[in-house]
């Protein structure tokens, strides 16, 4: 630390006391005051934090605002951590100063369709259950709703915990503030005395695992080693009992997932993303080396017991395309199988926490590189991928992305308060709710009705292609039992299964991706037409083989 920073320490401490006064008023118990600590004492050990804190916008915020280190200071030494400080993970730690952002985050968008299945006749993917047969998502796959509910909705979804966790009552399903302040203020556990994964309700599954939860929360950030590897200092890992892990988690989408709490600078914390961008050298924009070079990510590794333990990724500049990609991305969050021999890939394998960081047309090769597939279809036996919300990769190369548009421009616009202050909305909602700040901000020649019309044009067209893809996939699936009964050879069936993989991939990407093609309409059209072609090819192959078998009798 240079002398200039040391001389500025008193000024930073005094300014930080102002925030501390506000913090004590908002969060302390009656009669309790937050007593600032000497940050220089903390920096004696936490040298990496010093580098970030002293030069960032949070330089005036004292350590005690987020940490209770009373016992830690008394028991720590240069060789031993001592009693670990208590670190605040709740979003209200930031709300003291960033009130407007917090209030917008907890605001529920009541215009959305809560818990609407994607697999209903009028929804996005009417034949989803048939096409995904054999996978846990067939038990429930709903449209997304407000981010405030992202953790609690994971706990209650029918495919995850067998119905163990439920809302305390139906009124709680609207309680965005409660869901943000603590999941267990709105949820109940059917059997708090047990931790085994089992079915409490019929027509449910127990498919959850610890990696799933890394998108929903980072409450466990200090207890999780890099990539979820087992480590003697880690309380949780990829192989932990997921029910016990779930009970230890409370808050959705912690502020520090995107904002470094010490510097206030932009960052990411999802280890799978850091691994893809930095460790594997794919960069922030794999299809645009120039942009990837401009938007760099620096991996910062923290040690525990003098061993590398966890890591964060500091961004050169704020880029919501990268920050949102911590969750809005296709990645492995489950066990699976090897393409080469069908052997099981367990949660102890790093492939169970893997970001492919590839678009729909590069995914197959990326999966082959790590020798992985997710599940076998219950009817055809084909080895298939199971795709998760690949918004980031879909956006790459689109007209909007090439013109410098980022996620926040459309989903988190700048909003002016009554006092004239401008802040970034953290409501993360559809541009339909704020066309003036989103679409019309660039398309000034349009009216709001024209912009909505263009959106509907793209999404309606894409949805039509999704439905056609499903029709031909279903037709192909229905032919497999017929072909088997007719005595069609395994060689022909395997050829059809390979076509099934392609048809499934190029279809399901667009049921998992949440824009119904709007993020990249040209890519959606090409992909879905490819799916239809592959299904038709398989249908023709199977029909010809069936006819040949019948004729030979």
From Swiss-Prot:
This is Cytochrome c-552. Catalyzes the reduction of nitrite to ammonia, consuming six electrons in the process. Has very low activity toward hydroxylamine. Has even lower activity toward sulfite. Sulfite reductase activity is maximal at neutral pH. Residues 1-28 form the signal peptide. The keyword Metal-binding applies. Heme 1 binds at residues 42, 45-46, 72. Heme 5 binds at residues 147, 324, 327-328. The keyword Iron applies.
